[in-house]
């Protein structure tokens, strides 16, 4: 077999403890199992096999969205620091848990290296307790990059580094960080340290990990206003139009139009507008000669690209659509809810999204069931040639009925009698090879993944209603 050699950034595992409905540690894994079905879309090298898709099913209030929120929390912690409303996000079914740290661990292929990053935080007070980063070698040996213990005021640069000056430099910054219990060291070491990375190339592993969280991980939920990679550009408009047309929207062409700044200022909160502009100005400081920093702001039925031109002037653009006639163009508000949702999701199908991880809650919101299935079929076919990873939550059982998913691409979230969310990969149930997953959900084999109705209470309500 010829092993793949391209540079990769892919998610391996994500673990969470004492966060929202997760009490004891729950591990979400993208590691491939023994299934032979659709093996072309499994990434493999000498040491690991990874799936590129994971669909998470579960009853209402089982905790599916809480897993997505856990991803979002970790990303926010790394990029922006503690998000608002964090103090009550521990597992509150057990009051004593407010005094127990919440823990998060993420395992990645980062430039083909197996990297593990983890931290623990006491959410009730917002105090970070521990943080560490290390590499796991092919022989399963740990090579520490750094270890930070804020309870004991300890910081140690690890044996990952070979250069003595690099170790001294990292320890210097690390020792300064042990008094700050609200910020992760990974965040601190990635603000205003460009010269340090130039002078100490070994430290770039810290920069690469930060970039993964900032640019290669996209977390989306139905209510979020997202700022991210501006994927609507003149270079890929045809690709987007062709995809939208193939998915049955009737759209045949797109064009980019400029929007007056005053109109946008009146549409979005001043705080958000200022944050987007501030982020662009920070990017502008280190941009190359030909690079114009840009960011996309998107919410329901509105897409805007903010960019600074060569003179650092702010330019805001949006997109318009034509159907059969290219002489008439419409804005997004004039399109259907389904088309707006497709535009929110189309990024996962673009070539520029290779090597990225998308975590999306309620992918089927506003989409016709057939559209959801067709879009997933298209993504899974493209996954044979790309290394984009897609993690979604869904209630759409037709995805199971269509039999387009491998068993190791399916995960269930159930809630036990204690109110704890439990992650159960489908492979845990050890279905027979000839057993169809859709049938197993309704014949009792997978009964614990379905909503738990109280038939006795329902009959009582009906009886009372008739009396």
Regions found by a protein language model. Name each.
Residues 222-334, 456, 460-462, 466-467:
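Extended helical coiled-coil dimerization/tether regions that scaffold
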Residues 95-161, 413, 425-434, 440:
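P-loop NTPase motor core
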Residues 86-90, 298-303, 394-397:
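Short Pro/Gly-enriched beta-strand edge/turn motifs at strand-loop
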Residues 43-50, 54-55, 59, 68-126:
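Conserved P-loop NTP-binding catalytic core
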Residues 105, 116-118, 250-258, 359, ...:
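A structural signal for short, well-ordered beta-strand segments and their strand-loop junctions
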Residues 9, 23, 99-101, 112-115, ...:
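Coil-to-beta-strand transition motifs
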Residues 1-79, 313-455, 461-467:
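Switch/communication elements of ASCE P-loop NTPase nucleotide-binding domains
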Residues 120-276:
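Electropositive, glycine-dotted interaction segments
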